[in-house]
Amino acid sequence: MGLLTFSINLTLDGCIDHQEGIADDETHAFFTRLMDEGGAMLWGRVTYEMMEGYWPAVARGDVAAPPAIREWAVKLEAKPKYVVSSTREDFPWTHSHHITGDLRAGVQKLKDATPNGVLLGSGKLAAELDRMDLIDEYKLLVHPRIAGHGPTLYESGLPSTRRLELISATPLRCGAVAMHYRRAG
């Protein structure tokens, strides 16, 4: 069984608005390494739609992009992508699959079938899966910014405090810190 690893950009005040993160070669290389380590991507519909509107064009070369960003796009194009949605059924992007029915069972089945693990990259979906105790590790890229607005991570709350064990904290040149945690005991 593979691990479910939640990874996202966030500011010091917990904002997960994708426009608030630092998008440079180093941060893209960080996420490319994470994607290389995992066997599949898992997103909610909103994240999928944001991604499908841009990254396939970068992978095809229709949009000019620096080498690190193009590398991310090409690898993402080839990666299996699983989407949780109750409002959309058609996901035409290459290697995209719809998780339907019982969320807990569907995600557990995906973990069981993906020995290299699943990389989860949607904030709202992460909160829901964390309430189900399905997330095994957290690889967060914390940016040196205070956004002062939302959306924020876990704004819908959890039933109790989640205790984590720090595995590593790695500063990047841009001032962001890559934090790696796993669930404690």
Locations of the language-model features?
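Enzymes that bind and transform nitrogen-containing heteroaromatic metabolites
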Residues: 1-185
